[in-house]
Amino acid sequence: EQIAEFKEAFSLFDKDGDGTITTKELGTVMRSLGQNPTEAELQDMINEVDADGNGTIDFPEFLTMMARKMKDTDSEEEIREAFRVFDKDGNGYISAAELRHVMTNLGEKLTDEEVDEMIREADIDGDGQVNYEEFV
C-alpha cells in the first residue's frame, strides 16, 4: 500500500517517465507546491539520497528518502506549512476546490469523484472539508 503510494508520488516527480528524478523535475514539483528552491538547494536535496552518485534519484533512492522523512516525522511547522499550501483562502479548511487546485498544479488530473473521495477519506466530522486536525 505504502510502496504503491510512493510509486505514485515518484511518477508525479518523474515528468518524462524515464525512471529518474532530475533537479529540473524536482524543482518543477516544488515550485508547483509554492516553494522556491535555488538550483544549489535542489542539487543538495538530490545529493542527499543519490546513492550511486549519478546526479538523479531513481525509485529505490526515492524510497530511502521517503523512509528518512517518515522517520523524523515532519515537524509541526512543516505539517502546518503543507496545510497552508492546500488551504488557499486561509480559512482553516481545505475544500474540494482547493484540493483539486493543488493536485492539478502537481499535474494530477483528478475527476470530481476522486477529489470528493479524498476529502471523504480525511473528513472525520462530515462537514465536507478537511480541517487541520483531520489533515494531520
UniProtKB/Swiss-Prot annotation:
SMART domains: EFh
Statement: the UniProt record of this protein carries the keyword Cell membrane: no
Modified residues (N6,N6,N6-trimethyllysine): 109
Residues covered by the EF-hand domain: 1-36, 37-72, 74-109, 110-136
Keywords, ordered alphabetically: Calcium, Metal-binding, Methylation, Repeat
Chain positions recorded as Ca(2+) 3 binding sites: 87, 89, 91, 93, 98
Residues the record lists as binding Ca(2+) 1: 14, 16, 18, 20, 25
GO molecular function, one term: calcium ion binding
Residues that, per the record, bind Ca(2+) 2: 50, 52, 54, 56, 61
Binding site for Ca(2+) 4: 123, 125, 127, 129, 134
GO cellular component: centrosome; cytoplasm; myelin sheath
PROSITE patterns: EF_HAND_1 (PS00018), EF_HAND_2 (PS50222)
Keyword DNA damage: no
Pfam families: EF-hand_7
Lineage: superkingdom: Eukaryota
Function: Calmodulin acts as part of a calcium signal transduction pathway by mediating the control of a large number of enzymes, ion channels, aquaporins and other proteins through calcium-binding. Calcium-binding is required for the activation of calmodulin. Among the enzymes to be stimulated by the calmodulin-calcium complex are a number of protein kinases, such as myosin light-chain kinases and calmodulin-dependent protein kinase type II (CaMK2), and phosphatases.
Misc. remarks from the entry: This protein has four functional calcium-binding sites.
Family: Belongs to the calmodulin family.
Protein name in the entry: Calmodulin-A
Species, as recorded: Oryzias latipes
